[in-house]
Amino acid sequence: MRTLKSTPEKDGFRMPAEFERHSGCWMLWPERPDNWRLGAKPAQAAFIAVAAAIAGGEAVSVGVSAAQYYNARACLPRNVRVVEISSNDAWMRDCGPTFVIDGNGRRRGVDWTFNAWGGLNGGLYFPWDRDDQVAQKVLELEGADRYRAPLVMEGGAIHVDGQGTCLTTEECLLNPNRNPHLTREQVEEQLRRYLSVTKVIWLDKGVYLDETGGHIDELACFTSPGHVALTWTDDRSDPQFEISQDAYQRLRHAKDARGRSLEVHRLHQPEPLFMTAVEAAGIEAHPGSHPRRAGDRLAASYVNFYIANKRVVMPLYEKRRDAAAMRTLKRLFPTREVIGVPTREVLLGGGNIHCITQQIPRPQGA
């Protein structure tokens, strides 16, 4: 692995859409007791179910600490690769690399600067030094050259269509706890350089009470060129109502990089979900970590799914809303099997399926 001084844009590399072909998927293993209840055992079961669902259509690798290596190897399916990688938590989407490809069969990776969603100004834990090393270690294992981007950002803050368009939110990427020295125009320029996009569509806020600070992957994502899935609610009393309405209007009036209008598909969120007293009691309190309390509203969204080669793996919350969301996703992905996985235990930790996965795209001609 080489660390390159150029940029993907300059070298002819781009970030492909998640719905393009993959070579595989990376995840991390949960274990910290101040974020995952009951010593992370319930969360580990959910991660295992997600890994198994994805492994039915593409290779899956899971990074695990030395202390948890034998436990993870014993629990995960045999067709899932287990690799020792130190990390501070288990959010591969955010601390892992963003892979980019060119038209000559080559793949490289972008290593963003990670500060645990805000550093000492609203971040979720300290320290985060091992997380900031994860992307480089994954790229080393994948034999992919590395671009170290001068931008504090997480993979969940962006969604691309693979044809020059990027979705993000002002709440996240313009937050002073990420890049206070950069203007909106300068942030856009960095996205152009490292993703090879030519159009950035800015939505205002992410999902209500998303503790990452407004990640796009809870709110909206591309399902195919010109098509966007959007978290939705018809409940005017829910703060999410105005957020989704504003996002809908921005998307409906936007053009993508190729000049197309966007078709927006509403994915109704589940009824508001809250952390129970029993769940909160199972989480240890540690200094420097985001507290989790009974009654906290959980940022539940059906948009936080993973698009695999042959499958879409979606979170399950409650039967009625689950069924409606699955019907919508089957319509949006007619050539893929839609598989639901119960992931409340992941949600309790602050994210969901998309947050714990990172696709490895297959370069053209490979």
Describe the role of every protein-language-model region.
Residues 1-366:
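Histidine/cysteine-enriched polar flanking segments
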